[in-house]
Curated annotation (Swiss-Prot):
It is found in: Membrane. This is Putative uncharacterized membrane protein YPR170C. It is a single-pass membrane protein. GO terms for cellular component: membrane. The chain crosses the membrane at residues 20-39. Keywords: Membrane, Transmembrane, Transmembrane helix.
Length: 111
């Protein structure tokens, strides 16, 4: 949204963002910190629910896809394969970074 402001000295155009930068940074930090705390506690189940519940809740075949994704997810963590765990969290952090860097995507996801 753009707003034109006229002052005695000059005309200038001010562009308003959907969210202030401070708020976006705070949201990113809160999500990152909570996922890191859950990961360090070893509570993979809680961190999995934290990130997957909003996505899986609205899917059409929720039960079927949820059971399948649970099996795939827990097979990675039951094997205690650090490489797979690292790939999972790296992909998650990349997604969150892109989400914060793109204000349009961020606004669509939060509506």
């Amino acid at each position: 949204m753009t707003e034109r402001i006229t002052t005695p000295n000059a005309d200038r155009t001010v562009q308003h963002h959907a969210l202030p930068v401070d708020t976006t940074g705070l949201i990113f930090f809160a999500v990152f910190a909570s996922s890191f705390v859950l990961y360090r506690r070893g509570s993979c189940f809680e961190s999995y629910l934290f990130f997957s519940f909003p996505l899986s809740y609205f899917s059409n075949n929720r039960k079927k896809s949820r059971v399948q994704s649970d099996k795939q997810f827990f097979s990675v963590f039951k094997k205690n394969d650090p490489e797979q765990q690292h790939l999972y969290y790296a992909a998650l952090m990349q997604f969150l970074t892109q989400l914060v860097e793109s204000p349009t995507l961020f606004c669509v996801c939060t509506q």
